[in-house]
């Protein structure tokens, strides 16, 4: 319900927001309501995508939703009789969605919406927000014990890496590329895989995503895309000519 505040606008106040949305470029209130419903559906699907990606990524999004709900609950609880305008700009943060979802119309139109709590059935909304908060807290508690040591997907990846090291497709080929849709998962994988590969095989790892600077376990090595790729694929990138005095080589690349 955190993503559908328009559902709680009182019927007697609906015309006010129909006119307001019309002034912002929408033909009627249904466009804003439809956008909210779309974002809610996308977030439901997105939570499943992030859970499939990694429990770490899932938990981050879950925490952000919980924080948003709790902030809104606090705002409603502090509401008195005066005019309190609720700014809805941040209720559809696209950063938790993958690139395909971010390109939908839900994130390109009608973002700046303000709703006066005096125009809402905020008592019902508050009750449903509290129910959502309770359910999400229970879900958080259920996944809290899934540490990297108990993360079956991560441990399965370690097994695959062990097999790759023991049985390379080409003799001496230790190169591994791991792709993921979410930068949060890339961070999680880098933190765990880099340590695993360094401790067990003495191999270096790098991470490249589109949202942050790259990372690498090689000290004093620039972590920009070109440098990382040159060290990961030294023959094809001509590393001997570009970096003749640097013997560093990256064997594991984690990327989005």
Please describe what each predicted stretch is.
Residues 1-223, 243-255:
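Helicase motor interdomain insertion/brace
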Residues 225-229:
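Long, amphipathic, Lys/Arg-enriched alpha-helical "connector/arm" segment
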Residues 230, 234-243:
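AAA+ P-loop NTPase catalytic core and its hallmark functional loops
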């Amino acid at each position: 319900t955190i993503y559908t505040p328009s559902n709680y606008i009182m019927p007697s106040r609906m015309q006010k927001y129909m006119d307001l949305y019309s002034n912002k470029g929408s033909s009627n209130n249904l466009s804003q309501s439809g956008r909210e419903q779309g974002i809610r559906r996308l977030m439901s699907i997105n939570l499943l995508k992030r859970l499939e990606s990694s429990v770490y990524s899932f938990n981050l999004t879950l925490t952000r939703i919980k924080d948003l709900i709790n902030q809104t609950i606090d705002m409603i609880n502090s509401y008195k009789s005066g005019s309190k305008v609720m700014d809805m700009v941040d209720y559809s943060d696209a950063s938790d969605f993958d690139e395909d979802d971010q390109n939908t119309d839900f994130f390109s139109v009608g973002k700046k919406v303000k709703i006066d709590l005096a125009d809402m059935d905020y008592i019902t909304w508050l009750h449903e927000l509290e129910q959502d908060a309770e359910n999400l807290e229970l879900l958080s508690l259920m996944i809290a014990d899934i540490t990297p040591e108990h993360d079956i997907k991560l441990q399965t990846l370690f097994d695959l890496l062990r097999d790759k090291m023991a049985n390379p497709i080409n003799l001496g080929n230790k190169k591994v590329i791991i792709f993921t849709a979410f930068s949060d998962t890339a961070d999680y994988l880098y933190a765990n895989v880099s340590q695993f590969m360094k401790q067990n095989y003495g191999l270096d790892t790098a991470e490249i995503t589109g949202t942050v600077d790259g990372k690498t376990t090689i000290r004093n090595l620039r972590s920009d895309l070109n440098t990382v790729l040159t060290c990961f694929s030294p023959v094809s990138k001509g590393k001997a000519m570009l970096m003749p005095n640097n013997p560093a080589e990256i064997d594991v690349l984690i990327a989005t």
